[in-house]
Amino acid sequence: MNQELSTNPFNPVAPVKTFDEIKISLASPERILSWSYGEIKKPETINYRTFKPERDGLFCARIFGPIKDYECLCGKYKRMKYRGVVCEKCGVEVTLQKVRRERMGHIELAAPVAHIWFLKSLPSRIGLMLDMTLRDLERILYFENYVVIEPGLTDLTYGQLMTEEEFLDAQDQYGADAFTANIGAEAIREMLSAIDLEQTAETLREELKEATGELKPKKIIKRLKIVESFLESGNRPEWMILTVLPVIPPELRPLVPLDGGRFATSDLNDLYRRVINRNNRLKRLIELRAPDIIVRNEKRMLQEAVDALFDNGRRGRVITGTNKRPLKSLSDMLKGKQGRFRQNLLGKRVDFSGRSVIVTGPELKLHQCGLPKKMALELFKPFIYSRLEAKGLSSTVKQAKKLVEKERPEVWDILDEVIREHPVLLNRAPTLHRLGIQAFEPILIEGKAIQLHPLVCSAFNADFDGDQMAVHVPLSLEAQLEARVLMMSTNNVLSPANGAPIIVPSQDMVLGLYYTTMERRGMKGEGMAFSSVEEVEHALAAGEVHLHATITARIKQIDDEGNEVVKRYQTTPGRLRLGNLLPLNAKAPFELVNRLLRKKDVQNVIDTVYRYCGQKESVIFCDQIMGMGFREAFKAGISFGKDDMLIPDTKWPIVNEVRDQVKEFEQQYMDGLITQGEKYNKVVDAWSKCSDKVAGEMMAEISAVRYDDAGAEKEPNSVYMMSHSGARGSPAQMKQLGGMRGLMAKPNGEIIETPIISNFKEGLTVLEYFNSTHGARKGLADTALKTANSGYLTRRLVDVAQDCIVRSHDCGTENAITASAAVNDGEVVSPLSERVLGRVAAEDILVPGTDEVVVARGELIDERRADLIDQANVALVRIRSPLTCEAEEGVCAMCYGRDLARGTLVNIGEAVGIIAAQSIGEPGTQLTMRTFHIGGIAQGGQQSFLEASQEGRIEFRNPNLLENANGEQIVMGRNMQLAIIDEAGQERATHKLTYGAKVHVKDGQSVKRGTRLFEWDPYTLPIIAEKGGVARFVDLVSGISVREDTDEATGMTQKIVSDWRSTPKGGDLKPEIIIMDPDTGNPMRNEAGNPISYPMSVEAILSVEDGQTVRAGDVVARIPREGARTKDITGGLPRVAELFEARRPKDHAIIAENDGYVRFGKDYKNKRRITIEPVDETLNSVEYMVPKGKHIPVQEGDFVQKGDYIMDGNPAPHDILRIMGVEALANYMIDEVQEVYRLQGVKINDKHIEVIVRQMLQKYEILDSGETTLLKGEHVDKAELDETNEKAIQHGMRPAHAEPILLGITKASLQTRSFISAASFQETTRVLTEASVQGKRDKLVGLKENVIVGRLIPAGTGGATSRVKKIAHDRDQTVIDARRAEAESAAALAAPTDEVIDLGPEDSGLVETVESRKE
């Protein structure tokens, strides 16, 4: 940690200091003067003839130091021997020129000036301190109004504003000395310096206790916060007003002579000049006793000049330079992408680097790259020079330089020596995850392009269509070591996002391997038997046996005991060849490759080899199968011709059939049986099914096996092989080429009803082409926009997670989360074993129904244990998670589990936050770039039924069914579930039944897989009559709350509930349908005894007439759902962003806060009141307000459970956290984020999302401050909260009560403990203003802060080094203490007893060895 500040800028002579933290606070005028080396009195910069700086000007050499090293300005003293002499003629100290980068000056202001940051940055700090509004403050500061500072005995009040006339009148009325009023910054300064902070804090606390209402306490708390922060930090309020202005060193605002006698200067010099000019003029005016109005105007101008210097454009007009361009002020230097933080401190340029185009290098090994000789020569120059000198081939650097420039033969030999085993880093922009920079050993090549190994392309996301890559040379030994051990491409086989191999063959290689492992009937040599692989190779070479023939052969294998055995297999020569490359291992048997290998299978093979045979073997294996894949693809000669796209003969019959269907729907619509919306949905559905059907026919045709005359199997269709192997192309693209193009989407995302029936092979008609251009254009536009959005999301994620590092091995927490298989629409999308892989078990995992332990508590679940869990049919597993980790800073290794990129338990010092951010952000860009591949084809079609995904017995939970007139079972309950139970009594699947669904099975019935369980209408929500009777309309008045929609096309009318609140008469209506008893004429009552009534929501379609007889189970009304929109990652990226930003959705769901019964209370103007009466008497009932006209799915008297939705919609994550706790929130977030990525087929491990959610949950909101210093509504860290509460409990005071809150990633980043990190993220000025008022200390624990101050990051090797240094330092300290104790005891023995001689400070030489040892 103890890093050295090379020279202390404020005092270069002082010894080098080490620091552990950085504090930011307000500078007092005395502090500014102590930094300064002199006052700047003139606005001049340099003399235009001599180019020497003017004395007392902005570049004065007397104040800031000499212009040339060790030479005074007039040239009287030169060279080192006069170091430190001050020249008596020109007053310049003889020293290094670089002090001009460090020495500051100052300007004595003739009138105080307010610091604009503390005035205008919201909330205004000066305003809060004085309890004045910003508008009033500006009036005083810019000399419009007077303010009363000391009212005396008059009836004016403190802080009252007066205009000039009022002020003069008051002076006449009360006399000039009766009260004090003032104007300008002086007045504000007087008021600020008069504040007694402790007294104010006391008063505010008292007021807070008595304050009631909503706004008053908030306001008091705000003021109290700022007063407390001034007290704690030791700042004084009046320091927010400047009396002395610091001037930054001249080298930091340089003036550079251009050719032609002109100068380029930093804008700051202009801004400083304006300040000095106005300040000098003001001084002169005051001396001359100028009229008040003139002086006041000059003061106002001075204030404006200083404002512009600090933050140009924050107030008033922007000050522009000569070319109408706004001048860059001090704030602009820090802000934004081009500011100091992001441009220079976080984004430095690198020396020893070069870039060039990349080409493929298939003959390279995985750890190599081809480096052009020209580049290598340039990059390794210093190494070559030193080697040339060492060999005696040159005596000076100059000579060596000449040799290299001439490119003599010996230079090349030396270059070879230098480069041997010296890794270089290759990087491809955009570097979206850590695999975008990898280390390789360079191989010198002719030519000018870098050669890249084909297998690492997917990690870099590189292709060879003109991509460029950058090369960097690690110079120091440590850097070379890290490059080799951590970043070598061979050490990065697995992806950190999901733990799957990322070094995977693609395209040609996959095609070659697919072709190699094909098996065809009736080929030459079928049925032959071979004794060894060599024999097979011989037969292949001789042409006696075909690559794809079925043969029998023996091959060496390892059995489970580890002995070599020879086994016989029925296989093909191609597979045998591949099997011969497999490392010999019991876990990698020949069966692994004895099948048709598609891309996924190849990935599995590599994964298996990596897991069981070690890294070295797997890397060699990868290289070999790459070579084999390329070779075989080339030999196979698989090509692509237009005739390979087959159009099925059945296409037109299918299309015509659907055309007739669509005509029928049109007719139904004309007859008024269905609405426009329903017709649209049905048509779109029919066409999307038709398009799928045609595609299916095409695939069947193209994949059909054909035989030649001899009965031998023909080679499959080459396009089919490309797509089926996973090399290139997808069924969706083949469908467009050979099936029908399908439905298209409009630019706004709606699906056009008429599909494109032609495919590309047949050609499109003009209209079809026009329709298809929408999709294409939308795709391109989307791509451009999304790249930016995705990059910004990654940046926010990195910022929120950057200080999440593995800091300890085990935090010892008892908390955990429950993992279960992810199920989507009753289909298991990721099994339990996949979700718990690489996690640590929090409890013993038992075989269900027994006491047999599968995985013990605290064990890491690896592949083997995960398989055991699967075999045991465990349904739920408690696992440790970063969310519940209780480590002080960062997380612990046990809670995090396996490091996905290494396959072992994570190391201490791993920056898991950054890895999580990259893993989530990287696919964002990938996905966004992949929107347009399918060309905007709509994947329409809504699911409307559910089939059993497994065999088992049906079990209903909370059943509530009603049989309608047709004998169908209709679901009437809100929380009914249907579960499928297997023989062992384990629950295999549960489905939530929506209200109004038809159930096709009975309770306890056994079902086979594929049985239809229930169906529902995907387009409308029905409202169903519970009992039979007569329907009676209430408040459904035509023209007010009901509109009759007459369809022009059909002439049929429909009654639709319209928004009655918008009509003048409709304010108090409550439109509903009541079911009446036809005999008595009273409303029918349900089981709870309430009258059966159905409130209508806006846009509901009425299905019954007033007075019509209805039967139980009939539909009374239908509420339309949203139309089918296309699912595109467009929904995806913004969705992920809004989840991580924790935004409340527009119409968010209302979640029940506790178990209870629903009651409808008295209505407001346009809201309905729903109350939940809790079952538990101790709890209070909770009220919700719902806008009238919204559909409420619960009835009076319904029982709801905690967490049920009272109103449909997307839930707000804050509500989930508040009501159901952290684990429910985590599950919600993980499921929602994974949903988006899964749609794109991207796998991301859950733990990355958990790490980000953990960072969002770091703060607690104080609900009740108790007797602590914490304030209600304040956000504090858990550590801070615990500390404060412990103190309070020790002193017998009431502790504060708080609850965890969820912050969006932007908010969480801005509220981190480190102000340096927050300032470099966003809103720089606001963050720095706040931090300086509070006197914040940055402990430098995160990554960003350390990079900014120029240290190694406290993660990885940097963390290890600092840890070692700390241990060494502690040991030194103990040694020193021991020596000191020894010396003291010896001294005590030697000293005479009666009078102890005080040797004074001279004797301290023995003890103080600290200085000499401290590094």
From Swiss-Prot:
The keyword Phosphoprotein does not apply. Its cofactor is Mg(2+); Zn(2+). Zn(2+) 2 binds at residues 811, 885, 892, 895. SUPFAM superfamilies: beta and beta-prime subunits of DNA dependent RNA-polymerase (SSF64484). Signal peptide: none annotated. Binds 1 Mg(2+) ion per subunit. Mg(2+) binds at residues 463, 465, 467. SMART domains: RPOLA_N. InterPro entries: DNA-dir_RpoC_beta_prime, DNA-dir_RpoC_beta_prime_bact, RNA_pol_asu, RNA_pol_N, RNA_pol_Rpb1_1, RNA_pol_Rpb1_3, RNA_pol_Rpb1_3_sf, RNA_pol_Rpb1_4. One of its GO terms (biological process) is DNA-templated transcription. Keywords: DNA-directed RNA polymerase, Magnesium, Metal-binding, Nucleotidyltransferase, Transcription, Transferase, Zinc. Zn(2+) 1 binds at residues 72, 74, 87, 90. It comes from the Bacteria. The keyword Zinc applies. One of its GO terms (molecular function) is zinc ion binding. GO terms for cellular component: DNA-directed RNA polymerase complex. It catalyses: RNA(n) + a ribonucleoside 5'-triphosphate = RNA(n+1) + diphosphate. It holds the Pfam family RNA_pol_Rpb1_4. Gene3D superfamilies: 1.10.132.30, 1.10.150.390, 1.10.1790.20, 1.10.40.90, 2.40.40.20, 2.40.50.100, RNA polymerase II, clamp domain (4.10.860.120), RNA polymerase Rpb1, domain 3 (1.10.274.100). NCBIfam families: rpoC_TIGR (TIGR02386). Belongs to the RNA polymerase beta' chain family. DNA-dependent RNA polymerase catalyzes the transcription of DNA into RNA using the four ribonucleoside triphosphates as substrates. This is DNA-directed RNA polymerase subunit beta'. It comes from Cereibacter sphaeroides (strain ATCC 17025 / ATH 2.4.3). The gene is rpoC.
